[in-house]
Structure formats: structure tokens, C-alpha cells
Amino acid sequence: MFSLPLAVSAAAVLLTFLAAAWQDWKTRTVYRATWYPAAVIGGICAVLFWLEYIHTAGALFILLLSLAFAALCRLFAALGMFGKADAKALVLLSLAVPVTPFAAWIFPSLAVSALVNAGILSLAVPLFCLGYNLLKGNRAPFWLMCSGTPAAGSSVKDRFGFLAETVTEENGEIKKEFVRMRDTVFSLKSPMRHTRTLRERPEECEGTLRLLEKCETVWVTVGIPLLVPLTAGLIFALFGFSAVDILLSLLL
């Protein structure tokens, strides 16, 4: 369904996603002003699009679905299930580009398809980690082989992720113990295990930083911001590639 206003909106949103993904990758922070230009352009273009297409078959369903999905994203962000930047990205996409202007309509909406595509693409991360660790000869529990890599102790604070080893010192000897898989949900979410805490609150982490400096390597989980696969998923969805459609075609 080609629509010039929708194409302009899609271009603005895609450029915003690329900028936000880059910021999130480099600093794990997305500046609030990043969203403003696309929100204004997308808002105007979305109104023009709906004025032209609101009476076509299925338009009301798409509009209601877009509004419901945006509301759910806001709710999930409030409940801590999404990051604020991720929620803003999905709300912007859902409202500003309800359908792709560059391909046939994909079920159920562009935003949903982009999110599902992102989930599928994210599966490459554990495969990459496992392959990398096997090639390098790194050894750790299997779950960690699929989710992390070893880093020099002195550089851990510059990584993005969670410490996957507990480091202690007894009688001048450094001892390391892997976090058990059944404890990861609670243990790895501890602020004191987050590498960002080591950077931003060094005075509180002085003891941990001192121990890490003495370690040759320490295992750290690999943190990939959702905005990175989400942006890739959006690019695929914009041109009609939808994992949702593929899965439904296999099942039906």
C-alpha cells in the first residue's frame, strides 16, 4: 500500500531508529530529543494517511490495532518489561507507520512484525557467543557459553552486561566462582553486578574494582540493546519480510 505521507513517515522513523540504536549501542542511553523530529513528522503524515485511507477495507482494524499496541507498549514500560527507549520506539512506529508503504500489508501490523523479527534475529546472539567461545577455547557453563564472553579484569567496567562470576580474595589468592544458572535471574540483576554500576558509582564498587584488576579474565554477559535487533527487524518488515507471516504460512 504505497502512500507518500506514509513513505515520508517511514523514512523519518527509520532514520530515528538508526540514530537511537547507535546511541543505545554506544552509551546505553537514548537522548529524549532523538524522538521529537520523527514524532512531529510522523504525526502529521499519519493524519494525512488516515484522512485518505480511513474508509478503505480493514483500515479501522489497523487503526485500532495500532492504538492498542501502542498502549500495551506504554503499559509494559511502566511495569518494567520494556526499556523506556524501546517503548518509545515501538509507540512511535505503531502510530506513525501503521503499515508498510513499500510492500503488501503484512499481518497483523508493521510494529508487531518488526518486534517479532527482532526476536528472531536476537536468537543469533547466543549462537554467535557459543561459536566464538568454542573457537577461542573458552570454557564455562553452557548457559554462559551462549550468553557471555571472558574479558580482561581491568576492562570489565568498560563492557556492557553483567558480571557472571563472583570474585573473592582469601589469603592473597583470587578465587572466582561462576554464578549458577538457577540464580541468574536474581543475581545478575543485582545493581552491583551491572558493569554500568562499576563505571558510574566507582566509590561504592571500590572493593570489586580492586579485585577485578587482579583478575586476568572475568566472564561478562553480552548485552545487546533491543533497539539494535528492533531496527534490523524494522528494515526487514518495511520491505515485506515478516516472521509472523512466515510462521502462519507454515502452520496454516
Residue locations for each model-derived region?
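A membrane-topology feature that recognizes alpha-helical transmembrane segments
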Residues: 1-252
